Amino acid sequence: MSNIDPKARTWAEIDMAALKHNFEIAKRTGKKVLCVIKANAYGHGAVHCGLFLEKQGADFFAVACLSEAIELREGGITKPILILGYTPEKYAEMLAKYDITQAVQDERTALEFGRYAAEAGVNLNVHVKIDTGMSRTGIFAQGEEAALAAADTIERIYNIPGITVKGMFTHFSVADTPSEDEYTAWQFKNYTTVLNALTAKGLRPEVCHASNSAAILAHPEAHLDMVREGIILYG
């Protein structure tokens, strides 16, 4: 017989009062609040935290991948869920089945999602990501000319059967660095150039968002319709 205690030797105790306090920082902006609970809510327990935050008034959740989104739905989360990362386009029907919103990074991906969704007889909600200066993923929109071209691309995405554009977002790369505020302002200008061009076409997305945790605290001008509260939820 082994004398080893099978119970875990370590555990984490989550202070839900602290989580509520941190959530309310974003809520005080007066905007919709998207809570980022990817990677098991940064190790804090995605379903447990998600259910709690939903009761506190969270409007939206974001995760990294399809399996994380399904875990939330099956755990009882009812608010909209946005997948920030890549999902193979063939899973369009599953995304629609679980009422999950998918981020799309380019026109080709949007076309493929639309094709699979139309073949399955479903409609998929998407948020279009634009690259205003992070230089990672999204439709290129750095500078006025590129931003106007991005608006034309998004106009074409609006017309793809099988998908509905519900939102548009970007990610600030250095919003947490005061010495780089000029760059964050440039990114936001690129975003608003795209947004204004779409609005002129009669295509303003329902939910526009750009502010990550740092921008919630430091850049109120960029709060738009919704803010994305990530790491500041947890510490």
Where are the model-predicted features located?
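Active-site-proximal beta-alpha core segment in soluble small-molecule metabolic enzymes
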Residues: 3-6, 10-13, 18-21, 31-209, ...
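Histidine/acidic residue-rich metal-binding segments in metalloenzymes
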Residues: 24
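Active-site loop ensemble at the mouth of alpha/beta enzyme cores that anchors a bound cofactor
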Residues: 217-235
